[in-house]
């Protein structure tokens, strides 16, 4: 289990499925009124050693979100009615027919009826921001590609030549293939020292004068005829 303090009033607790299993818990246990559910939450709080400002702070609001390999629990200080009773959960529909998401949505609605809806709305907003932040961090740490290659389609050789004459940017390599009655060109770009948007920008420029590729380079090597190797664009640009 891991705990992260998001703000003075909010914590995020990550509990793996292994943690649940080790303690004899299942997702459905959070909706079935029984003592071990309460005991589990008390145990988690004790193990994680809550920050001082959370100790003896009264009622806490929880937002539980199931993931593929864990559950995320967002906790915030709340004015939720202290009379909330787990026995109230016995009125739920047949939980055996519910997905984990349905389980926790139902639990959230019950908590709204009993207590502080504002606290739950705050948790939902915090969870959304955390998810967006995580996705942004994943994007920033994603390994940058050194090269990218595109395949372009042309109905005739004249359009291939016309396209070649529009290329005024650096190209690492290019090949020209013919397959059936159509022409196909592969274009390799070097992305080193280029901004993240460069590949998309160049592809958009190419599509102004070419069709989006319908064949892969591997397919063309096997089924097409390679007319020009390596420097197809340079050779085509020399045609008057």
From Swiss-Prot:
Gene3D superfamilies: 3.30.70.1950. InterPro entries: MecA_C_sf (IPR038471), Neg-reg_MecA (IPR008681). Pfam families: MecA (PF05389). GO terms for molecular function: protein-macromolecule adaptor activity. NCBIfam families: PRK02315.1-4. Enables the recognition and targeting of unfolded and aggregated proteins to the ClpC protease or to other proteins involved in proteolysis. Belongs to the MecA family. The N-terminal domain probably binds unfolded/aggregated proteins; the C-terminal domain interacts with ClpC. Homodimer. This is Adapter protein MecA. It comes from Streptococcus mutans serotype c (strain ATCC 700610 / UA159). The lineage of its organism: Bacteria, Bacillati, Bacillota, Bacilli, Lactobacillales. The gene is mecA.
